[in-house]
Design a protein with these regions (language model features):
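Transmembrane beta-barrel wall of Gram-negative outer-membrane proteins
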Residues: 179-180, 213-298, 315-332, 626
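Gram-negative outer-membrane beta-barrel transporters
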Residues: 460-465, 567-576, 583-708
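Surface-exposed extracellular loop regions of Gram-negative outer-membrane beta-barrel proteins
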Residues: 123, 298, 476, 494-545, ...
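Periplasmic N-terminal accessory/gating domains of Gram-negative outer-membrane beta-barrel systems
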Residues: 22, 39-156, 166, 170-172, ...
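Transmembrane beta-barrel strands of outer-membrane/channel proteins
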Residues: 181-189, 240-244, 290-296, 335-341, ...
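C-terminal beta-signal and adjacent terminal beta-strands/loops
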Residues: 116, 578, 687, 695-714, ...
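Face-selective signature of the C-terminal outer-membrane beta-barrel domain
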Residues: 275-298, 311-478, 603-613, 617-628
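Short loop/turn motifs that connect adjacent beta-strands in outer-membrane beta-barrel proteins
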Residues: 143, 157-159, 174-181, 231-236, ...
Length: 790
């Protein structure tokens, strides 16, 4: 696979022309260099995945998270996708250089696609106020995309409102020379995988749930895609992509008090995607793009021990954008206008949730709970206007400049709504209602203005390049004026690209969490007989930010080996957490958000790959080895994020010692050292491609909260929270993908692919409890993929 490498981005195959055109607006200091690499890796903080890269990688459920899984700057939550829940198809959370998974910026064609309503709440529990969210506003199918760029460090000044990184997905643009239709089908099922389940979890796993935690004992996944590229008139055309990803999961429909399964039912997990872009090359000076986008996700649940508790939870996002590029005599002007609607919802089949102390329902006798809690949702409409002006390069003596300036305005109309009245209560032995709560119908909103200005300059002198920049952000949600300096320098030591050094300092201010402002609106509709109230305080918060020091090295070894090393140090400041207290006089529970969270992260990666593939008997061989190490310490749980309530503790007991809380290693996303060997074999005459990844992960630790009944609990430290780490063994996994495009069917362009994930069927523990119950990663898994272009 051919790769074209520009400092700051890897470009691949047939996508080079468009990608280079896009990147010319950004960093392009030196001449291009060709490399061959099975898996894209960061170059000066940018990793570029083209459609060719996406087709090569085993992308599992087809989400952006699956695509980024092998990136050395990224860590996944290893407890999110396990042997217990392989039927789930939702995107997984990612942490970039140890930052909060809820502080990444997701973009589609440069416009924000981040869901900042309440991304830390991924609970599927049945509740009157629970609306599950996720930081990815659009659940994109990566097979429909032109390319994806991850900015993990040295992030350019035009990107903001993040702490971790930026993920920018590009929708395919019309190409008059490539009018094709593509059909695709991809599938797997529970019969095609090995599940490793702890004996203590087997009963709940076979039932399909434990309380509000859902498992996938029996499922079938079927993914369908259709895409096309069509010229409509001279210099005017359209691309479109449609997909449905569906997982049908069979779980217990009803479980009696004594654990008897009384019937099973099928529950659907569906993600629909529709993307389209109309392009008009009006002249040599003007190009227009009109982009339409939609994703809809829905998941069916019930609480198996509660009759009539069926509900649907999901996300719907849609929007449009108009983009105009204008080539002036002295500069290039880009103007973008967009609108995006992002929403999350929970819709129960019933509006009343009640408990009877004495009832009979099927096999249940005695106390039982049944029903639902109505329909509730929250959403945000973002109206975006942005513009950017890039001056042509000018020179004074040996020094050249290429400055650019930009501005952005986003109006966010965030709202929450209870669509119907619902209520909950308990019927006591006398047949009377107690603990009665009414959730009234209502709707409320808040409007937020977001302003951004930025400027930067590409300065080159001989074989040294500098890019200083500064970004200013303000919004009337937290009313903070945030100034972000960005600086990067690059030195081509011998002016021949054999030895290059990059270094820089950058600051990244995060985005807002809108649920803090919507929560009191939603809670105001709750009428409790007890008179209990809730109050949320967030108005005096600072905007969380990360300071970054980074360095990159690139060295050509001999004629054909490229070595790259990157080091990133991050300090996270003013991270949001919370504390709660109850005012007994007013019966008010007050939740107050604060800026007590902080972390420090050291991140290092090293890779070796070839400038040209090895040619042996008509077979191209592309080897690559990648080392990655990320270690964080701090007083913040990344999974809990802004809902973390422990950061006020100055000291805790950790592994038997009383220590400062912020000196304790971060427990989640804790996979420090990873080494992967990637090896591609391509036989052009037959159309066979065999891609392999062999990955080793060092032994890790699972964090356990100790209670007084645990043997490790130290009674003399009873005033402190106590934690202990349990060792999880190292792991070795092998993923492989075999693709065949028969050369005798060139006109049909048929491709058949098979993925085998975890070929060795390694049994890897990813978590354990304080009672010793382990959770394991998925075992060996088979996928089948068929596509045709015509």
């Amino acid at each position: 696979m051919k790769r074209v490498l520009i400092p700051g981005v890897i470009l691949c195959g047939a996508d080079v022309a468009q990608a280079v055109d896009d990147k010319n607006m950004y960093m392009h200091f030196f001449e291009e260099m060709t490399v061959y690499a099975p898996v894209p890796v960061p170059v000066n903080g940018n990793t570029h995945y083209t459609s060719e890269s996406i087709e090569r990688l085993p992308t599992g459920n087809g989400n952006i998270s699956d695509l980024l899984r092998t990136n050395p700057a990224v860590r996944m939550d290893s407890t999110q996708s396990t042997s217990l829940n392989q039927g789930d198809i939702r995107p997984e959370k990612i942490s970039i250089h140890g930052a909060s998974p809820y502080q990444n910026a997701y973009l589609i064609d440069g416009i924000s696609a981040t869901n900042n309503l309440n991304p830390a709440n991924e609970s599927d529990a049945s509740s009157a106020t629970n609306i599950s969210g996720m930081s990815q506003g659009y659940y994109l199918d990566v097979s429909l995309l032109d390319n994806v760029t991850l900015y993990d460090s040295f992030v350019p000044v035009e990107f903001g409102r993040f702490n971790g990184g930026v993920i920018d997905a590009k929708i395919k643009r019309f190409n008059a020379d490539d009018s094709k239709v593509k059909l695709g089908y991809r599938t797997t099922r529970s019969d095609w995988l090995t599940s490793h389940i702890d004996e203590n979890n087997k009963s709940a796993f076979n039932q399909g749930s434990s309380g509000s935690t859902y498992y996938s004992p029996d499922f079938k996944k079927n993914f369908y895609t259709l895409s096309f590229n069509q010229e409509l008139a001279d210099n005017f055309g359209v691309t479109a992509g449609l997909s449905r990803r569906q997982s049908d999961i069979t779980r217990a429909d009803y479980v009696s008090n004594d654990g008897i399964v009384a019937g099973r039912a099928q529950y659907k997990n569906v993600i629909d995607t529709a993307l389209s872009k109309f392009t008009w090359f009006a002249s040599d000076r003007f190009t227009h793009d009109l982009t339409l986008k939609y994703t809809g996700s829905s998941r069916d649940y019930n609480t198996s021990t509660f009759p009539q508790s069926d509900r649907e939870m999901g996300n719907k996002s849609y929007g449009l954008a108009w983009d105009m590029d204008t080539q002036l005599a002295w500069a290039k002007l880009r103007t973008t206008v967009g609108w995006d609607h992002i929403s999350d919802y929970t819709r129960h089949d019933h509006d009343i949730w009640y408990t009877e102390l004495s009832c009979t329902y099927g096999d249940i006798t005695g106390r039982c709970t049944r029903g639902g809690l109505g329909h509730i949702s929250q959403a945000v409409d973002n109206y975006t206007f942005k513009t950017r002006l890039d001056w042509q390069k000018s020179a004074v003596g040996n020094v050249s400049h290429q400055p650019y300036f930009g501005a952005e305005y986003i109006y966010s109309d965030a709202w929450t709504e209870r669509h119907n009245q619902s209520e909950s209560y308990v019927i006591n032995a006398a047949g009377k209602k107690t603990n009665h709560t009414i959730y009234h119908k209502g709707k409320g909103s808040l409007g937020i203005d977001n302003y951004t200005l930025y400027m930067a300059d590409h300065i080159s002198w001989r074989n040294v390049s500098l890019m200083p920049g500064v970004r200013y952000d303000y919004d009337n949600y937290l009313s903070n004026h945030n100034i972000s300096p960005r600086f990067m320098t690059e030195w081509d030591i011998f002016a021949d690209q054999t030895s290059m050094i990059t270094a820089g300092y950058n600051r990244y201010y995060g985005g807002n969490i809108l649920d803090m402002g919507l929560r009191d609106i939603r809670n105001s509709w709750t009428e409790s007989v007890s008179g209990n109230k809730t109050l949320t305080r967030y108005q005096n918060l600072k905007t969380p930010y990360n300071d970054e020091l980074a360095m990159g090295l690139q060295q050509k070894i001999g004629k054909n080996v490229i070595a790259r090393a990157n080091y990133v140090y991050r300090e996270a400041h003013d991270q949001i957490s919370k504390s709660s207290r109850t005012d007994s006089a007013t019966k008010t529970t007050i939740t107050e958000y604060n800026n007590d969270g902080k972390t420090k992260t050291h991140s290092f990666n090293l890779s070796f790959e070839l400038a040209e593939p090895l040619h042996i008997s008509q077979v191209d061989i592309n080897p690559q080895i990648v080392f990655s190490y990320i270690k964080s310490k701090g007083n913040l749980s990344l999974n809990n994020g802004y809902e973390e309530s422990n950061t006020g503790d100055n000291q805790v007991v950790y592994n038997g010692n009383l220590v400062s809380y912020d000196s304790v290693p971060v427990a989640d996303f804790n996979n420090p050292l990873k080494i992967s060997l990637n090896m591609d074999f391509t036989h052009q005459p037959s159309g066979l491609v065999w891609a392999n990844t062999l990955a080793w992960q060092e032994a890790r630790k699972a964090r356990i909260i100790l209670g007084k009944t645990n043997a490790q609990y130290i009674s003399e430290y009873s005033d402190y929270k106590q934690y202990v780490d349990e060792k999880l063994d190292s792991s070795l996994t092998w993923d492989t993908r075999l693709s065949w495009t028969p050369q005798f069917l060139k006109q049909q362009n048929l491709t058949i692919s098979a993925d085998i994930l975890n070929v060795l069927d390694s049994k890897t523990a990813v978590d354990t409890t304080n009672t010793g119950v382990a959770t394991y990663a998925s075992g060996r898994t088979f996928w089948l993929d068929v596509s045709m272009k015509f």
